[in-house]
């Protein structure tokens, strides 16, 4: 893969690109990284590359030097990426996609940004490495190169590690252990010592799911949502469907205080508390019955529920989420794409609720 970096400070990249895995990949010609100084395309005697914006504020990179620099290295198969906090978030999935490209041109942001006309004319995609602002786009460019290079065959000593690493299946990696078996009174989990590979794989998945739920609810929500999309039945291979009809489903929710839980659900979903007793059904959906069972806190089992809501519009979906928070529940994460909106919430007893609403086509 060839990568051209366009920056005001090409010397910034010398150290990272000459050491460790990236340095070795460049020496082995798995990566061909070239640096271009934007100032070489500056205007006038002083090679001016920036100017004051018409809207006021800090300096901007001018359109002409930027477009000239890009066009000097652009080929027919090039993909131009502007590293910007306004771009789509860099993910493992996006890194894998970019690794399939033959030529990337990375435009590093400087000052307060770049004249929009240069972006509209030359940039194929804007990418961000997170919701924060850096001193220059060179840092972001290095992050992208490092993330992408892992998926280029031969860059890693063991390519399988790229597939197994954290985030590759949408989850954080779980805890890992090495010798000794016991350290300061803490022992390695017994399941890892028994040699049962199936049990170990199951344990690792469970630990990854738990850690992701606790530390990155946004990733956990996306993981569950994508998994629900992937788990579809093949109409042609599914037989005797008529023999497996379900009239009603009952879900038991263990709660600390029955009255408190009942009041919460009734207020959120607009139900009559007097008629609910210790069970309730959601409005317009009578096939699922939620039973509330009062238990002691230490004996309570936490469950995760996923509900696809039939709302008239996205505003109605957001209204439900506001009611959830208003009456004491927690809204942990909310995401959206062109197909759906979904949210991860937590009720008063710690049960996880995944609400989704699919946009009409």
UniProtKB/Swiss-Prot annotation:
Keyword set includes Phosphoprotein: no
Keywords: Cytoplasm, Methyltransferase, S-adenosyl-L-methionine, Transferase, tRNA processing
Top enzyme category: transferase
GO cellular component: a single term: cytosol
GO BP: tRNA N1-guanine methylation
Record flagged with keyword Transferase: yes
Protein name, per record: tRNA (guanine-N(1)-)-methyltransferase
Species of origin: Chlamydia pneumoniae
